[in-house]
Each structure stands twice: as structure tokens, then as C-alpha cells.
Amino acid sequence: MKKRNQHVIPLGNGWAVKEEGKERFSLISQTQKDAIHFAREIAKTNQAELIIHGKDGRIRVRDNYINGSNPQKVKQH
């Protein structure tokens, strides 16, 4: 099964959720919190990775749901 990693990325004054390798956004939100909640549910359902970017576009946090629903967090600096 193909992994459906989810990225939460800045978009203008808001945030977007985008599946890795796809062109279209899954969600556009005013808040990062809502975007993260949406992306986390998709990542859990598909046993994928949630990658959260900061306002500068750099990866801030990676949550790995590949082996179940308990994420393995990796913070980027």
C-alpha cells in the first residue's frame, strides 16, 4: 500500500494540507491547529507520516503513524 504522507504547510495568511506527491490541497484553513487536526486523522487512517512545516516552510515536526496510532515524534531544528 502506498504511503499517504500528509504535509501541513503555510499558504498565504493560512495553512494547507497536501498529500505528498499530489498537486492539489486536501484542505485550506485559517489556522494551523485545524490543518494539523485534519492531516493527523488522514495520517492515522492511512498509517502514514504527518509532516508539519513552520511559517518559514521548514519542517518543524514529524509524527509517524506508520506502525499504528501512537506517533513517534521527531522534532526538526
Predicted feature locations:
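A cross-kingdom feature marking charged/low-complexity
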Residues: 59-77
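A short, exposed loop/beta-hairpin motif centered on an aromatic-Gly-Thr core
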Residues: 22-33
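Short aromatic-glycine-(Arg/Gly/Cys) micro-motifs in beta-strand/loop hairpins
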Residues: 2-24
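Residue-level signal for glycine
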Residues: 23, 57-59
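Short arginine-rich
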Residues: 41-53
